From Swiss-Prot:
InterPro entries: Bacterial_PTS_Sugar_Transport (IPR050864), PTS_EIIB-like_sf (IPR036095), PTS_EIIB_2 (IPR013011), PTS_EIIB_2/3 (IPR003501), PTS_IIB_fruc (IPR003353)
Keyword annotations from UniProtKB, A to Z: Cytoplasm, Kinase, Phosphoprotein, Phosphotransferase system, Sugar transport, Transferase, Transport
Originating organism: Escherichia coli (strain K12)
Pfam families per UniProt: PTS_IIB
Domain comment as written in the entry: The PTS EIIB type-2 domain is phosphorylated by phospho-EIIA on a cysteinyl residue. Then, it transfers the phosphoryl group to the sugar substrate concomitantly with the sugar uptake processed by the PTS EIIC type-2 domain.
Phosphocysteine sites (modified residues): C10
Protein name as annotated: PTS system fructose-like EIIB component 2
One GO term (biological process): fructose import across plasma membrane
Primary localization: cytoplasm
Length: 106
């Protein structure tokens, strides 16, 4: 089963952080994939990704509007960087691109 992990963060750390997390989770689950999303919002890290989550992930999605804390833990993984607004509005399209990429590398 494909496993996707993601970290969402936005400049204000409020609504878009959580809206993006929800949209990415829904889009990945619609593909039948396992997904876990860490949020880095105004109240800190929530649903923090473990070393095991990172090691077992097929793909990492990071929002790029502001810096992601502890990004070095994803060294060696395939990373897709997206705008927070795209994660909210175009999560299905992001997952389709990931699916195509994974099919090419399989």
């Amino acid at each position: 089963m494909t496993k996707i992990i993601a970290v969402t963060a936005c400049p204000s750390g409020v609504a878009h952080t959580y809206m993006a997390a929800e949209a990415l989770e829904s889009a990945a689950k619609a593909k039948g994939w396992e997904v876990k999303v860490e949020t880095q919002g105004s109240i800190g890290l929530e649903n923090e990704l473990t070393a095991e989550d990172v090691a077992s992930a097929d793909m990492v999605i990071l929002t790029k509007d502001i810096g992601i804390k502890f990004e070095e833990r994803f060294a060696g993984k395939t990373i897709v960087r997206v705008n927070i607004s795209d994660a909210v509005k175009r999560a299905d399209a992001i997952m389709s691109k990931i699916e195509a990429h994974l099919a090419q590398t399989a």
